[in-house]
Amino acid sequence: MTILLGVIACGLLSVVYAIWATKSVLAADQGNARMQEIAGFIREGAQAYLTRQYTTIAIVGVVVFIAAWLLLSGAAAIGFLIGAVLSGAAGFIGMHVSVRANVRTAQAASVSLASGLDIAFKSGAITGMLVAGLALLGVSVYYLILTAGLGHEPAAREVIDALVALGFGASLISIFARLGGGIFTKGADVGGDLVGKVEAGIPEDDPRNPATIADNVGDNVGDCAGMAADLFETYAVSVVATMVLASIFFAGAPVLATVMTYPLAICAACIITSIIGTFFVKLGANASIMGALYRGLIVTGALSILGLGAATSLTIGWGSIGTVAGMDITGWNLFLCGIIGLIVTALIVVITEYYTGTNKRPVNSIAQASVTGHGTNVIQGLAVSLESTALPAIVIVGGIIATYQFAGLFGTAIAVTAMLGLAGMIVALDAFGPVTDNAGGIAEMSHLPPEVRKSTDALDAVGNTTKAVTKGYAIGSAGLGALVLFAAYSNDLAYFAANGDKHPYFADVGTISFDLSNPYVVAGLIFGGLIPYLFGGIAMTAVGRAGSAVVEEVRRQFKEKPGIMEGKDRPDYGRAVDMLTKAAIREMIIPSLLPVLAPIVVYFGVLLISGSKASAFAALGASLLGVIVNGLFVAISMTSGGGAWDNAKKSFEDGFVDRNGTRHMKGSEAHKASVTGDTVGDPYKDTAGPAVNPAIKITNIVALLLLAVLA
């Protein structure tokens, strides 16, 4: 009980930090009237979009809430509600701050680069700490209510089902927010670039482009609210899955309650280390923005090792806590698994930066390919996107095997928990991106002096890299988290099958085998494997349609208002924002339901065909593995490849020197080819790739809930 209260106190501390940082950001200077006017357009557009998005999700949520109440229990329905509301709140509040921090960052950048960095990072840290704090509070407070308040045993089905439902609530918000926000932001970006840069020859963030405000709105709803919902879900779902595994592996043991609070204690310790880490993000004498951000991340990671040790010592201790599948599990081994999780995080960050960072081989190779035309740019971009999957996959495989050797599947779960303990700092780095991007746009549209734009460009270039790095982290943690969920599914299934007297549906299941000689297992693997590709294809098509609509709208305005190009007429910014809002909401519904319904279709489809519950459960389990494996590769390929395309385009803004020593500037044929590549890469890295993340996890969560419903 004492540990749990300490966990809740740490969750509250992160919320207090967010409130303090919000007051600090909002107290900063907003700049001149023109800057405030442009920021107002962005703020209104972002709030209008999110309000409409959450209204749509609420309608779906009400249906799911009623279904959970009828099929499971009132506690499960309330758990779903808690997960959904807190996930939405983290993204909404974070975006509420970011659309106010953008103009303040632009103004601060006119004073100094250090001031601009301070405001932008602090606004990102608000979102980060809200994600970590609200997710931890949601799980720990509800767990406390279910056990100490309602008197349920920690491993009781009422508790487990309610916590899994909480994860499902977060998942549902996440997939809608990620996909809807991605369609909006990339529809605006692609459409605006094709007409603005390629046809009209005007630079990015030029106020004459009617899609400019929509593009800046999209940065916030996609990279701030969308990423917040994504990592909130991964955080909550992975902690819940670890607790579910603890309830199965240590059922009946005296240490059960303590082991179930261990992942919560790890996350609580990491919140403290993340808050400390934020104070180390200061521009040094070398004026390296990335260096300042990495200093905060490294301090957080190093302190988290100490925090992990403290959490281990205060909860389970260093000795043996029990035997699982013939393996002696010790506190020391679990501590080592947590460190492996932190090492995996560091390696994924380094690898992703290598594949997406400017002046690195992959990005330079795409820029060089642009010199010979549009086609070679696309070919090289695709090559980099495929190559970028290898090293992260090897790191994840190494992490799985190492942790399994130390403490079995529970060790892998603890590694994922430690990875996600850093979510507060990681989300801060991500939410820093849209703020700096917007600040650059506001500086450009307000005609601030060139030296201000130079500062905002420097911040924005780093923001692009941090966004790519955090996507890599989100995918890696999602892949490992989904593996933990699969372990929870297979162990839950074994528990129900062994206790058929208490759960009549499972009384006649028989032996469930995931053997590859079973044709239903192979069929399940293939069916699961197609979901990320189909989901990604639908998402890319949606961006294409939204982008085409923006192209037509921008062309129409240029044609009907020729004074726009001369600066005599003002574009109708609101038209593009409203059009994209409707398109994104319309396009996100069907693909979002695909991973939700897939597990149900697999189970009942195979049951209908084979007449065997064992075959149906085996096919369902195999489909989950298919989603995890293919989803991991699709997501990494799309996000890293798209990030490389983006920074290859940016290489031409200051002039790219090819292998023959020729300098290619903005507006050159090579630059135009790089814009084409970036147009392909944008929906890759900001829509389809990131949206595969929640799709991987939600299929596993639905499978867990299906077991609970059938039981």
Swiss-Prot record:
Q: At which residues is there a site annotated Important for ion transport?
A: 178, 223, 230, 686, 697
Might you give the EC number(s) for this enzyme?
Answer: 7.1.3.1
Q: Identify its membrane topology class.
A: Multi-pass membrane protein
- Residues that hold Mg(2+) 2 according to the record: 216, 219, 437
Task: Locate the site labelled Determinant of potassium independence.
Answer: 467
In its UniProt record, a GO molecular function of this protein is: inorganic diphosphate phosphatase activity
- Reactions it catalyzes: diphosphate + H2O + H(+)(in) = 2 phosphate + 2 H(+)(out)
Q: Which HAMAP family match?
A: PPase_energized_pump (MF_01129)
Q: Which family does it belong to?
A: Belongs to the H(+)-translocating pyrophosphatase (TC 3.A.10) family. K(+)-insensitive subfamily.
The entry's protein name is K(+)-insensitive pyrophosphate-energized proton pump
Q: Which organism is the protein's source?
A: Rhizobium meliloti (strain 1021)
